[in-house]
Amino acid sequence: MALETVPKDLRHLRACLLCSLVKTIDQFEYDGCDNCDAYLQMKGNREMVYDCTSSSFDGIVAMMSPDDSWVSKWQRITNFKPGVYAVSVTGRLPQGIVRELKSRGVVYKSRDTAIKT
């Protein structure tokens, strides 16, 4: 796991609404999302960080070896970079972003376990 993907503080943590990666708000703004920045372009854009992440999430798991981990299969994060992930993320991406993802062939499934999609 790369050191820059580990949250540097326990305050101001947010989880990506697309992949559930957990970082501080400053890490998302400075580095973007390690898995989704090609689609969400949060790097250097605090407004996009607020739109595409949530401060409300339940549980965290540290995923180091995606191919060997049953947790990564359970959480649907097998194809993502090693890092710290939320078990459930409250909220949804804005409709405009969901439409853009769909036009690029990316299927968005909410990571909010309270909502069935």
Swiss-Prot record:
Region (Interaction with SUPT5H): 1-40
Pfam families xref list: Spt4 (PF06093)
GO cellular component: DSIF complex
Entry keywords, A to Z: Activator, Metal-binding, Nucleus, Repressor, Transcription, Transcription regulation, Zinc, Zinc-finger
UniProt entry tagged with the keyword Transcription regulation: yes
CDD domains named in the record: Spt4
UniProt main location, coarse: nucleus
Stretch forming the signal peptide: none
Ranges that cross the membrane: none
Localisation per UniProt entry: Nucleus
Sample GO molecular function, one term: RNA polymerase II complex binding
GO biological process: regulation of DNA-templated transcription; transcription elongation by RNA polymerase II; transcription elongation-coupled chromatin remodeling
C4-type zinc finger span: 16-36
Oligomeric form and interacting partners: Interacts with SUPT5H to form the DSIF complex. DSIF interacts with RNA polymerase II and with the positive transcription elongation factor b complex (P-TEFb complex), which is composed of CDK9 and cyclin-T.
Family per similarity comment: Belongs to the SPT4 family.
PANTHER family: SUPPRESSOR OF TY 4 (PTHR12882), TRANSCRIPTION ELONGATION FACTOR SPT4 (PTHR12882:SF1)
Record-given protein name: Transcription elongation factor SPT4
Lineage: Eukaryota, Metazoa, Chordata, Craniata, Vertebrata
This protein's encoding gene: supt4h1
